[in-house]
């Protein structure tokens, strides 16, 4: 039966934020309406064309490919044209025209084509003139029928009988206005009419939800005037509705069917299309065999030398390695993958030649001897027991996939090399599509419908978060009762009218969820084709980039025949590169190519859990695992990297116990001991599963890979089939059926979360390399880490703490020493010594008499110097001396790590110092730097960070004088530029521009630093309280790891709140706090609403608090949960202290008495009593005891001062 009507104007969500239909929905609507074909014509792109074609064919429908493009028909005037592919030539021209809209140079007003483009690529295309949005329609709306006729003839001349007049009836006045003229022109020029309907949503009831979608696109609310809207009739009208609507124009309906019959092409899958690496002299197959054999000989020569392998053993090893090489080469060449290996090898060899650090391997590719020989990987697969079949299985043909890690800073250079070698038109990135997921769509819809923010925020926080598998809104409603109730209109708050609006928000969000919102590019994927990309796929180009982007997602790019290469930027490789560069400047060369993984210092450091900065080993739980494991070989590091994941983590205690001979390994069967001995009986790796199947049940390694995959997927039918094969093979190997089934069950359990050993080994090597650098060259390594995290103040704090713990000196920001980035110096000028800010504790209200200032200059009251000072060592002594000369290793704080200061400004400062010497004063600094380089915020943060302490010891005075300093700068530079003579030079006024000011107290200085750098570098607000904390049983964070048993404990900690983060979960609101004390930064959670309510006044950033909390310490690390809070002042004031003081002479006695006298002026409040013990200078062993009758009200710093007189 001949169809009655075909929709030719259906748009999907690839018309971003314009259509509320997915590809699947478009096809399902056509199928349910008994249409044998459907045309997808998205606005401006063909991103969904292959997905559409494959899905339509799967459902038994004919896909018709179309696209709606802008065409320029006058100066800066555009209209729409709908182009449809008639055949393969037409589809290729459709690809070219749609891609041209993104790659033309004149995209300023909109993406478009010109008439010249249409003339060049018209072959195989059918065109519809888009009614009111088209050229003819726009001319008629402008009452220019003559112009309409002119352009109609022009399009007819270009396309002939492949040009149609599209007519629509959405009940819009503009359509009705032009219809008669439109039909008359069509008749006069004999251009066929074709009836269409804009299909943007499935049914009329979806109009309101679609209207919200348009508001999201425009960034406006529904109440916004003059916003874009569409007719409620832009839904998927049935054939019956369309026939009835155009009953007066039956030919327009019939022409939809006729047009469909002219189209006979559908996009389809293609075989892989790679550039041909062969030359006229040698084929790809011969070339890979030649390069691989030469490469293996070079690898073995290096191996024999670095591992001191005796000459008599070398021939045997050569035989083993070449046998494996030839086996792999045969498989690679038979699968026609030689070109792929050669392409990867080429750009990696180029990278290494250019000094760009490449990772030793990533993923299963590290298991290939061919890859090792071609320098693709740097891991000896046979030495590490890696399997080629895990990478390329001869029994399951699929494309190989090398993921390559490059130094992040130089990754673009490699991509540019590939572009230059194969051509810019043949290399491209891969597009990705951002979807409207549950949380985001609720926020978008709530904003459009003007739902108050607090309700929208509450709703979104109720949706559970999962980075790996985002939770759908429908799923969240099933799992979260509050969300389900809201969707039923029960409401979240007792506010009239809000329940109904909340229900509308959720109902609309359910309709729009999953639609495409925008496009971006894949983080690492690059495709390389053997022909221009636009011959195969649509291409896209971002206006800010000159690199092509494939318009299909990764999945459909591969189906189209494009091969993806992952060029990944790994920050750790940048750290290694930068560290080696710093060492090279000192004449130290580190060669990782010949590393033997046996450095004692490295393992000593790891055994102590010193994992900060070490690749894979930075988390608290991993550091704890290192302490318990006490690794002494690269195999331990590889195993731990594979085990430290949900699931396998439960086997860490077994691995550790067996390693330290506290438990006997279970090898399952004596035949399996050679396979499991390395991991103490624990099945960790997928390769072990393959070996077990091979040894025990006679599987080939290829078949064993299929078994591994089946076990990983846990598909019941496949598992049953594999178990039968496994048991039969084991029985043939003289193993009982019951034991075979038992082993199969055990292996299946492990295989479910088994890890790829090739990947674990490659990343284990990177872990070892970073650990080696840190253990042997800690200052240079930490500087490299710091410079990579220049804008992450939490990480900077962490790395500086690690430097302190390692006994490395750190110099605080100094305008005469610091550079744009962190640096390492071996000799520091004397001026760089960390020094006090004049009298650090400025007299307080009702404060100290003049004589007491001598007490305040006690050593305990000097600048805390947690990090800085030429003579400051780490506070912990758990690191053995590694032989590293720490006296020659001082880290200089970076100017670029100060807020509002860039590394470029730091370079400006450094260059000026090199050219004209150190800065002599604040005004000298301002005079010598360009006027435009300094602004108020920059100067403020430089002052607060202490950069100018060497030039001027009163930060508060400089801070108070910022406006005067900037005014002076402007006047000085204006005078310099004018070059005019003046009796009074501006520079002569410089000594008088600073406003008189007292010195800031310790706390003010500490928070100056926190505000400017996000951390406390030379002062910490809690340093002055350390003595009193010990009296109050308030622990230091260092005690948490060292002195507490495993399990749950209740402790008191003190800290300064540095960050506060409020979140929602299905169980309610919780808050995460980041705090610091003089030793560490730590994090704790508050789950109790009651705690949040009772102590909300104490939980502001910068608050000094004492927290009573539960601490859970286990193999996963330490977790802190707050139970109550108090301010530092309350904690001190609510306790009565008894002091015993022992002055050694009259001067000390006078200082004590003066200080205590200053603390007796508040008799209504006291927290201390004092007893003084005096020793007579003339009578041996005579001590006078004086109990003072007064009670005193002491503060934190007082206890620190008086500590010097206690025993």
UniProtKB/Swiss-Prot annotation:
Q: Name one GO molecular function term.
A: 3'-5' exonuclease activity
Kindly list the GO CC terms recorded for this protein: cytoplasm
The reaction(s) annotated as catalysed by this protein in its Swiss-Prot or TrEMBL entry are: DNA(n) + a 2'-deoxyribonucleoside 5'-triphosphate = DNA(n+1) + diphosphate
Location, primary (coarse class): cytoplasm
Domain of life according to the entry: Bacteria
Kindly state which keywords UniProt assigns to this record, in alphabetical order. Cytoplasm, DNA replication, DNA-directed DNA polymerase, Nucleotidyltransferase, Transferase
Q: What is its EC number?
A: 2.7.7.7
Subcellular location(s) per record: Cytoplasm
Q: Can you cite a GO biological process for this protein?
A: DNA replication
Q: Does the keyword Amino-acid biosynthesis apply?
A: no
Q: Which Pfam families match?
A: DNA_pol3_alpha, DNA_pol3_finger, HHH_6, PHP
Q: Enumerate the InterPro entries for this protein.
A: DNA_pol3_alpha_NTPase_dom (IPR011708), DNA_pol3_alpha_thumb_dom (IPR041931), DNA_pol3_finger (IPR040982), DnaE2/DnaE/PolC (IPR004805), DNAPol_HHH (IPR029460), PHP_dom (IPR004013), Pol/His_phosphatase_N (IPR003141), Pol/histidinol_Pase-like (IPR016195)
Family statement drawn from the similarity comment of this UniProt entry: Belongs to the DNA polymerase type-C family. DnaE subfamily.
Q: PANTHER family this protein is in?
A: DNA POLYMERASE III SUBUNIT ALPHA (PTHR32294:SF0)
Please give the function described in this protein's UniProt entry: DNA polymerase III is a complex, multichain enzyme responsible for most of the replicative synthesis in bacteria. This DNA polymerase also exhibits 3' to 5' exonuclease activity. The alpha chain is the DNA polymerase.
Question: Oligomeric state and partners?
Answer: DNA polymerase III contains a core (composed of alpha, epsilon and theta chains) that associates with a tau subunit. This core dimerizes to form the PolIII' complex. PolIII' associates with the gamma complex (composed of gamma, delta, delta', psi and chi chains) and with the beta chain to form the complete DNA polymerase III complex.
Q: What protein does this entry describe? A: DNA polymerase III subunit alpha
């Amino acid at each position: 039966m001949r169809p009655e009507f075909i929709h030719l104007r259906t748009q999907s969500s690839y018309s971003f934020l314009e259509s509320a239909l997915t590809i699947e929905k478009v096809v399902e609507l056509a199928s349910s309406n008994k249409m044998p074909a459907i045309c997808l014509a998205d606005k401006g792109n063909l991103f969904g064309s292959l997905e559409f074609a494959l899905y339509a064919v799967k459902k038994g429908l004919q896909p018709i490919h179309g696209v709606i493009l802008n065409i320029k028909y006058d100066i800066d005037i555009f209209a729409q044209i709908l182009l449809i592919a008639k055949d393969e030539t037409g589809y290729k021209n459709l690809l070219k025209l749609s891609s041209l809209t993104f790659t033309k140079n004149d995209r300023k007003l909109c993406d478009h084509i010109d008439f010249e483009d249409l003339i060049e690529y018209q072959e195989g295309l059918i065109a519809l003139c888009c009614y009111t949005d088209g050229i003819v329609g726009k001319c008629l709306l402008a009452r220019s029928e003559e112009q309409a006729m002119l352009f109609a003839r022009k399009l007819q001349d270009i396309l002939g009988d492949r040009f149609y007049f599209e007519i629509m009836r959405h009940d819009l006045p503009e359509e009705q206005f032009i219809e008669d003229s439109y039909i008359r022109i069509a008749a006069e020029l004999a251009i066929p009419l074709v009836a269409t309907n804009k299909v943007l949503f499935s049914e009329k009831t979806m109009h309101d939800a679609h209207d919200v979608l348009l508001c999201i696109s425009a960034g406006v609310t529904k109440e916004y005037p003059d916003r874009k809207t569409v007719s409620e009739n832009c839904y998927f009208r049935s054939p019956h509705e369309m026939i009835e609507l155009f009953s007066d124009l039956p030919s327009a309906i019939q022409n939809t069917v006729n047009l469909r019959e002219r189209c006979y092409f559908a996009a389809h899958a293609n075989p892989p299309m790679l550039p041909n690496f062969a030359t006229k002299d040698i084929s790809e197959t011969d070339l890979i065999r030649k390069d691989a054999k030469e490469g293996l000989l070079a690898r073995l020569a290096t191996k024999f030398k670095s591992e001191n392998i005796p000459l008599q053993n070398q021939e045997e090893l050569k035989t083993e390695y070449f046998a494996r090489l030839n086996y792999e080469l045969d498989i690679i060449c038979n699968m026609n993958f030689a070109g792929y290996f050669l392409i990867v090898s080429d750009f990696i060899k180029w990278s290494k030649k250019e000094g760009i650090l490449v990772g030793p391997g990533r993923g299963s590719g590290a298991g290939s001897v061919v890859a090792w020989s071609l320098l693709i990987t740097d891991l000896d697969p046979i030495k590490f027991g890696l399997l080629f079949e895990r990478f390329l299985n001869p029994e399951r043909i699929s494309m190989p996939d090398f993921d390559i890690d490059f130094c992040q800073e130089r990754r673009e250079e490699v991509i540019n090399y590939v572009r230059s070698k194969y051509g810019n038109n043949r290399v491209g990135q891969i597009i990705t599509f951002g979807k409207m997921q549950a949380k985001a769509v609720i926020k978008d819809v709530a904003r459009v419908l003007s739902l108050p923010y607090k309700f929208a925020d509450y709703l979104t926080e109720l949706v559970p978060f999962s980075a790996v598998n985002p939770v759908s809104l429908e799923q969240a409603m099933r799992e979260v009762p509050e969300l389900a109730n809201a969707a039923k209109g029960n409401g979240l708050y007792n506010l009239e009218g809000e329940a109904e609006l909340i229900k509308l928000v959720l109902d609309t969000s359910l309709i729009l969820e999953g639609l495409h919102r925008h496009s971006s590019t894949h983080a690492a994927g690059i495709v390389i084709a053997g022909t221009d990309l636009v011959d195969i796929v649509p291409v896209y180009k971002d206006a800010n980039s000159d690199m092509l982007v494939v318009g299909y997602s990764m999945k459909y790019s591969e189906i189209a025949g494009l091969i993806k290469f992952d060029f990944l930027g790994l920050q750790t490789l940048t750290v290694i590169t930068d560290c080696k560069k710093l060492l090279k400047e000192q004449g130290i060369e580190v060669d990782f190519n010949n590393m033997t993984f046996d450095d004692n210092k490295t393992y000593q450091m790891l055994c102590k859990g010193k994992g900060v900065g070490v690749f894979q080993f930075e988390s608290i739980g991993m550091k704890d695992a290192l302490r318990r494991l006490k690794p002494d070989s690269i195999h331990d590091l590889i195993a731990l990297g594979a085990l430290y994941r949900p699931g396998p983590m439960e086997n860490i205690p077994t691995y550790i116990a067996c390693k330290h001979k506290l438990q006997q390994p279970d090898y399952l069967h004596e035949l399996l001991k050679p396979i499991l001995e390395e991991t103490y009986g624990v099945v960790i790796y997928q390769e072990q599963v393959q070996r077990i199947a091979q040894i025990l049940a006679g599987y080939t390694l290829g078949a064993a890979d299929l078994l591994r995959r089946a076990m990983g997927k846990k598909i019941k039918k496949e598992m049953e089939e594999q178990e039968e094969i496994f048991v039969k093979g084991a029985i043939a190997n003289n193993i009982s059926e019951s034991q075979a089934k038992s082993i199969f069950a055990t292996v299946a359990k492990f295989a479910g979360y088994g890890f790829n050993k090739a990947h674990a080994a490659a990343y284990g090597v990177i872990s070892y390399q970073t650990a080696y650098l840190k253990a042997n060259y800690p200052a240079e390594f930490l500087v490299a880490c710091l410079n990579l995290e220049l804008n992450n103040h939490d990480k900077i704090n962490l790395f500086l703490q690690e430097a302190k713990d390692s006994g490395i000196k750190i110099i605080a920001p100094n305008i005469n020493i610091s550079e744009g980035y962190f640096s390492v110096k071996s000799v520091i000028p004397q001026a760089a010594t960390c020094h006090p800010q004049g009298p650090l504790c400025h007299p307080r209200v009702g404060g100290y008499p003049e004589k007491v200032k001598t007490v305040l200059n006690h050593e305990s009251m000097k600048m805390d110097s947690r990090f800085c000072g030429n003579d400051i060592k780490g506070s912990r002594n758990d690191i053995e001396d590694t032989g590293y000369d720490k006296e020659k290793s001082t880290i200089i704080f970076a100017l670029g790590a100060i807020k509002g200061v860039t590394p470029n400004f730091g370079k400006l400062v450094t260059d000026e110092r090199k050219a004209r010497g150190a800065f002599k004063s604040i005004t000298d600094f301002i005079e010598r730097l360009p006027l435009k380089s300094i602004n108020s915020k920059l100067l403020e943060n430089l002052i607060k960070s202490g950069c100018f302490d060497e030039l001027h010891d009163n930060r508060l005075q400089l801070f108070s004088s910022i406006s005067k300093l900037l005014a002076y700068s402007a006047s000085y530079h204006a005078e310099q530029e004018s070059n005019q003579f003046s009796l009074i030079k501006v520079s002569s006024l410089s000594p008088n521009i600073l406003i008189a000011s007292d010195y800031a107290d310790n706390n003010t200085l500490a928070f100056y630093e926190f505000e400017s750098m996000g951390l406390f570098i030379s002062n910490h607000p809690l340093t002055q309280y350390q003595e009193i904390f010990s009296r109050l049983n308030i622990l230091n964070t260092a005690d948490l790891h060292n002195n507490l048993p495993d399990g749950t404990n209740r402790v008191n900690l003190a800290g300064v709140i540095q960050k506060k983060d409020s979140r929602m979960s299905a169980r309610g609101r919780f808050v995460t706090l980041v705090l610091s004390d003089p030793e560490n930064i730590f994090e704790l959670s508050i789950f109790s609403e009651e705690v949040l309510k009772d102590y909300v006044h104490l939980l502001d950033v910068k608050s000094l608090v004492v927290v009573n909390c539960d601490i859970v310490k286990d193999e996963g690390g330490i977790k802190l949960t707050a139970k109550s809070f108090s301010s530092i002042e309350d904690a001190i004031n609510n306790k009565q202290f008894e002091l015993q003081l022992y002055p050694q002479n009259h001067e000390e006695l006078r200082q004590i008495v003066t200080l205590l006298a200053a603390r007796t002026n508040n008799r209504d409040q006291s927290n201390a009593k004092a007893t003084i013990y005096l020793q007579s200078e003339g009578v041996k062993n005579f001590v006078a005891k004086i109990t003072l009758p007064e009670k005193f009200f002491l503060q934190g710093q007082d206890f620190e001062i008086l500590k010097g007189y206690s025993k």
